[in-house]
Amino acid sequence: MLAQLTISNFAIVRELEIDFHSGMTVITGETGAGKSIAIDALGLCLGGRAEADMVRTGAARADLCARFSLKDTPAALRWLEENQLEDGHECLLRRVISSDGRSRGFINGTAVPLSQLRELGQLLIQIHGQHAHQLLTKPEHQKFLLDGYANETSLLQEMTARYQLWHQSCRDLAHHQQLSQERAARAELLQYQLKELNEFNPQPGEFEQIDEEYKRLANSGQLLTTSQNALALMADGEDANLQSQLYTAKQLVSELIGMDSKLSGVLDMLEEATIQIAEASDELRHYCDRLDLDPNRLFELEQRISKQISLARKHHVSPEALPQYYQSLLEEQQQLDDQADSQETLALAVTKHHQQALEIARALHQQRQQYAEELAQLITDSMHALSMPHGQFTIDVKFDEHHLGADGADRIEFRVTTNPGQPMQPIAKVASGGELSRIALAIQVITARKMETPALIFDEVDVGISGPTAAVVGKLLRQLGESTQVMCVTHLPQVAGCGHQHYFVSKETDGAMTETHMQSLNKKARLQELARLLGGSEVTRNTLANAKELLAA
């Protein structure tokens, strides 16, 4: 419930503080006094668009604050808790507008984006403007009103989720198809590159291995000759070799040891050298025996190495890196093949998600049909009460799967006849301005009863209504005020007389500046204001008597 509205330096208001109560509050005033200023200020607290000229002339900024009691608003309390903005069972929505047009929003003293003001505002209050009857002719608004009356959000939420999933699947498939030409060109190039590489099939570490083998084979003649020369020096030479010389040396040292035992260590070293020379000689003999002098193998290696160097140069990599590069091309080719397969998967996902969205849309269609009949009958009854005794109202709900959107696949059309013998036609083609206003008001009152919003504002929605019809409208709003906080800006005494509270808006000027005031009326002042509304500027006994009748009704 809206508990208080504080306005500072807004439009022609310098300072204003208004306390609101439960029930129906009416706001009246002379033409041009600014009856809707409080509603405009509240709209800004709820995240409405701000302009620089909204700031009072001469002031640096306008400051607007709306205080709400959250006693019976669990949805708003949950929203505040989820956004970590809760502060007990009250909520302050504040808007500060600078003279340069910039503005800031606050919830319970914390700066927030305007989108959050709007989100929370929708849970706290609904504003029905004087042009609501114009919206009534628009199909999308008709759908909004029907869904608002149904007040069944689960299917709508699921419909939105399913539609978004389908829409994302369509975008994914379109993006995939858009890139398919690029992938096809790349796949063709890869196929050309891999044809030669597949035939060669480079293996990791192979180049280093065959390069070493090639060097060995290429130098095998020199390796054999040099190895044999070394072997001759160590053991196989006929004239002299290290083994025979060591043998002679050992004999001489043995004779010396007989004369001096200190030389026994020298003999040990010569024995060890003899063993080392023998082992080295054996190893060198085995090496010579194993040495491959196959010229065919040498040619094969030379061709393999030459081809790998050529391919590496062609692909701008080193010969050693060619196997890794080859593997990367194979992996990329596999990815492209997988992506080609994924197009079919994406297409299947589009079909699947579309069918799921249509399934929810059909369920939503059935729900709307059910509530459309119920709402149409209530509106028909209200039309009869609002001086349209022959009025009939229907709501057509047509399913069109080609019209699938986030809110389903229904085309909603409000149809009406106001005179006997006339066929049902779209509401925009049949109803006059006054009739449209009455029908719009009836719908707003009926749908408001079903919604959970704890406060409702009707800003001159009774335009085009007068006499007995106005009295019916006043009673409808008062009945609504028994269960919901209702605020109504009106110029009709029949409506104003139905309020539980009454505020009067006036303005005064000193010749240089104009200022708007708003005051709560006691019973006596209220009689005077109702009499003014009934008779114009002159209050007479008759108008006062009529005013008393309105208050007593």
Curated annotation (Swiss-Prot):
Which parts of the chain are coiled coil?
Answer: none
Q: Which GO terms describe its molecular function?
A: ATP binding
* SUPFAM superfamilies reported in the protein's UniProt record: P-loop containing nucleoside triphosphate hydrolases (SSF52540)
Q: Tell me the GO BP annotations in alphabetical order.
A: DNA damage response; double-strand break repair; double-strand break repair via homologous recombination; recombinational interstrand cross-link repair; recombinational repair; response to ionizing radiation; response to radiation; response to UV
CDD domains attached to this UniProt entry: ABC_RecN
The record's listing under NCBIfam families reads:
PRK10869.1, recN
Please report the name of this protein according to its UniProt entry: DNA repair protein RecN
Classification lineage? Bacteria, Pseudomonadati, Pseudomonadota, Gammaproteobacteria, Enterobacterales
